[in-house]
Each structure stands twice: as structure tokens, then as C-alpha cells.
């Protein structure tokens, strides 16, 4: 919106210095600053409002340290989503299909998360929205993204193909499996970030690092020269995704101002499902979804810890008559909590691991 206004003045009157608005790096930086300022300035009032209405219920089986947070407000994801949407509308070419497809994913799963949080907090429905309906929403979003990118010429014939990390000019053609792959990745990532959101700042900080990396890949993929040099798929117009990524990064960082230990607010499913779906759609659009097991490694480990715990418990119960556990508690961060690790130490160590995964992902650009 603001971009189009400044673009009009620049092309009509050509005032000195206004041409900078045409640079992708300027608009990405402006979106980042705008998103951060909105979150920081709106945060205190938003927290006061939520504290008077929406208090996060804490499970009785949660670690003792976690049960102390029973009086904190949830649904903080609304603040993240608002900051992202406003920043993107102001500084991106929001008629670009890449942009609004990501924004659709953020809003779509944000609404699903809000319904889940509302049912838990206000309606006092144990468990909130049933897993079945969450899955229906995730599959529906995957269908929309998959079908639209398959049919819209703006996404070209490359959408059914993807690059393979560590291999130069090697691609995989999904063919008829493209839409199921899209559904799986969106479902897996949104659930993975949701599972990770269990400690102060863990999900927001980790998401910021992952999306920052994806923003770098998007910038490179949107430039034909860089894409050719690095042997990654060239995505026409994909550079606009970098603007969206920076808005998401700084909205998450701004939220971290209030969500770091000791937290003043939780993002709830409203934020975690929205961020997870955004990560998935961005990776799909820039053809780096096969890099997600590395880049989003922390989210993968958290999800695997839950899956392994459940499967092992069921197996041992069937084999020995009594279920046994590998971890003290799943997801993985709660295991370390029960081992006596301080919450801040767990979060910072997980951030460090995420940064290591980020750097490993960058190495794949040259290790081909």
C-alpha cells in the first residue's frame, strides 16, 4: 500500500532519494522495522487486554516450573499476525501471488489456532479444537496451496519440481504426488511449531531464525544471476517473499520482547500454527522444502520425541503389559526440564542448535 503510493510519487515526480523504495533490500528492511515497532508499541496494551479475558490453562501433569504460569494470557499470536499483515500490506507488492499465498496461510491457520485457544480459555473445552478438525483445516489449506500453485501460470511449470540439497542441478518431479506433499509439509510444520511452543521464547525465537534463513534463500532465488550461480531454482518474483520473511522475523522478535523468560504472554495455538504454516508455504514456494529437515531441525526433533514416546509406550504396554517411556516427558524440552535444566538454559541451547542448523543450511548452497 505504502509502496504503491511511494512508487507513484517516484515515477511521477522523481524526487531525490525516493527511488530507494524500488530496492527489495530497502523494503525488506522497512517491513522488518515496521513489524518490530508495531509489536513493541502495541504489546503492552494488548497484553493488558488479554490478561483481563484470556488466561492460559496449564495442564496438571506439566512440570512444576511450568505450572507457575497459570495466570498468563494467551492468544498472543494475534499480535504477531497483526504486525505481519500490516507490515506486508505497507511494504510489499501485495498483488504478487507469492505474497498473498503466504498471508493466506498465516491468516488461515491463525484463525484455526484462535478457535482452538478460544475453546480452551473461554469455553473451557478440554483440549480445545479436536485434532480431527485441525487436520481438516490443515489439509484444506494444503489443497488450496497445492491446487493454486499447480494451475496459476505465475508459478510456472517448476512448481511440481523441487531442488535437492547437496546436489547440483538435481531436481525431483513430484508429478501426481505434488499436492499430497504440500499437504504433508504444511500439516507437519504447523504441528511441529505448535509442539515446540512449550517454553518461554522457544517457538518464537526458533521461528525467527528459521524464517530469516528462508528469507535469505528467497532473496537469492528471486535473482536470476544468484540463482544460476548457486544452482538453485530461479523463482520469478520470488524476491518479494523476502519482504514477507523479514516482517515475520521481526514480528517474532518483537513478540520475544514480551515472551522471553519470565514471559508476560503466550502466543498460543493462534501464533504457533500460523508461524508453522508460514514456514511451510515459504519453503514450498522457493523450492527448499527438502531442506526443512535440516533448517527446521529443532522442530523435527521435538516432533520425533513425541512420536517415539507414544510408539514406544504403546509397544511396551503391548509387549510387557505396562507402558514404558524413553523420555521423562515429551516434547523434548520438557524432558530436559524434568532433568533439572533451567528453562532459560534449555531455550538458549535450542536457539544455538537452530543457529547451527541454519549455518548448515547455508553451507548447502556451496556443497553441491
UniProtKB/Swiss-Prot annotation:
InterPro entries in UniProt: Glycosyl_transferase_4, PNAcMuramoyl-5peptid_Trfase, PNAcMuramoyl-5peptid_Trfase_CS
Family per record: Belongs to the glycosyltransferase 4 family. MraY subfamily.
Q: What is this protein called?
A: Phospho-N-acetylmuramoyl-pentapeptide-transferase
Molecular functions per Gene Ontology: metal ion binding; phospho-N-acetylmuramoyl-pentapeptide-transferase activity; UDP-N-acetylmuramoyl-L-alanyl-D-glutamyl-meso-2,6-diaminopimelyl-D-alanyl-D-alanine:undecaprenyl-phosphate transferase activity
GO terms in the biological process aspect are: cell division; cell wall organization; peptidoglycan biosynthetic process; regulation of cell shape
Gene from which this protein is expressed:
mraY
Q: Which cofactor does it need?
A: Mg(2+)
Q: Which residues form the signal peptide?
A: none
Q: Which organism is it from?
A: Chlorobium luteolum (strain DSM 273 / BCRC 81028 / 2530)
What pathway is it annotated to?
Cell wall biogenesis; peptidoglycan biosynthesis
Q: Does the keyword RNA-binding apply?
A: no
Q: What's the Enzyme Commission number for this chain?
A: 2.7.8.13
- Record GO cellular component, one term: plasma membrane
Does the keyword field hold Metal-binding?
A: yes
Keywords from UniProt, A to Z, are: Cell cycle, Cell division, Cell inner membrane, Cell membrane, Cell shape, Cell wall biogenesis/degradation, Magnesium, Membrane, Metal-binding, Peptidoglycan synthesis, Transferase, Transmembrane, Transmembrane helix
Amino acid at each position: 500500500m505504502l509502496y504503491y503510493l511511494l512508487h507513484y510519487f517516484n515515477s511521477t515526480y522523481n524526487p531525490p532519494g525516493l527511488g530507494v523504495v524500488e530496492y527489495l533490500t530497502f523494503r525488506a528492511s522497512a517491513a522488518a522495522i515496521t513489524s518490530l515497532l508495531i509489536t513493541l508499541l502495541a504489546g503492552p496494551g494488548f497484553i493488558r487486554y488479554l490478561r483481563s479475558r484470556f488466561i492460559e490453562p496449564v495442564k496438571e501433569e506439566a512440570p512444576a516450573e511450568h505450572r507457575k504460569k497459570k495466570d498468563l494470557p494467551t492468544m498472543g499470536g494475534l499480535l504477531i499476525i497483526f504486525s505481519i499483515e500490516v507490515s506486508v500490506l505497507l511494504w510489499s507488492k501485495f498483488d504478487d501471488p507469492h505474497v498473498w499465498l503466504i498471508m493466506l496461510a498465516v491468516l488461515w491457520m491463525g484463525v484455526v489456532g484462535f478457535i482452538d485457544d478460544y475453546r480452551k480459555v473461554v469455553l473451557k473445552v478440554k483440549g480445545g479444537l479436536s485434532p480431527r478438525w485441525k487436520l481438516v483445516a490443515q489439509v484444506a489449506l494444503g489443497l488450496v496451496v497445492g491446487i493454486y500453485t499447480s494451475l496459476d501460470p505465475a508459478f510456472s511449470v517448476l512448481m511440481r519440481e523441487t531442488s535437492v540439497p547437496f546436489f547440483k542441478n538435481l531436481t525431483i518431479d513430484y508429478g501426481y504426488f505434488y499436492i499430497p506433499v504440500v499437504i504433508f509439509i504444511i500439516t507437519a510444520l504447523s504441528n511441529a511449531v505448535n509442539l515446540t511452543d512449550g517454553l518461554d521464547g522457544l517457538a518464537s525465537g526458533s521461528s525467527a531464525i528459521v524464517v530469516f534463513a528462508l528469507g535469505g534463500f528467497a532473496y537469492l532465488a528471486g535473482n536470476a544471476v544468484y540463482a544460476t550461480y548457486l544452482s538453485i531454482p530461479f523463482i520469478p518474483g520470488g524476491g518479494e517473499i523476502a519482504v514477507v520473511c523479514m516482517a515475520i522475523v521481526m514480528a517474532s522478535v518483537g513478540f520475544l520482547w514480551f515472551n522471553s523468560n519470565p514471559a508476560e504472554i503466550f502466543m498460543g495455538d493462534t501464533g504457533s500454527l500460523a508461524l508453522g504454516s508460514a514456514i511451510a508455504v515459504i519453503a514450498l514456494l522457493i523450492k527448499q522444502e527438502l531442506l526443512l529437515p535440516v533448517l527446521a531441525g529443532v522442530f523435527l526433533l521435538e516432533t520425533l520425541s513425541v512420536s517415539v514416546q507414544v510408539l514406544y509406550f504403546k509397544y511396551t504396554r503391548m509387549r510387557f503389559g505396562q507402558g514404558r517411556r524413553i523420555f521423562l516427558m515429551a516434547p523434548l524440552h520438557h524432558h530436559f526440564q524434568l532433568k533439572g535444566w533451567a528453562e532459560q538454559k534449555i531455550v538458549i541451547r535450542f536457539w544455538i542448535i537452530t543457529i547451527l542448523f541454519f549455518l548448515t543450511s547455508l553451507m548447502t548452497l556451496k556443497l553441491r
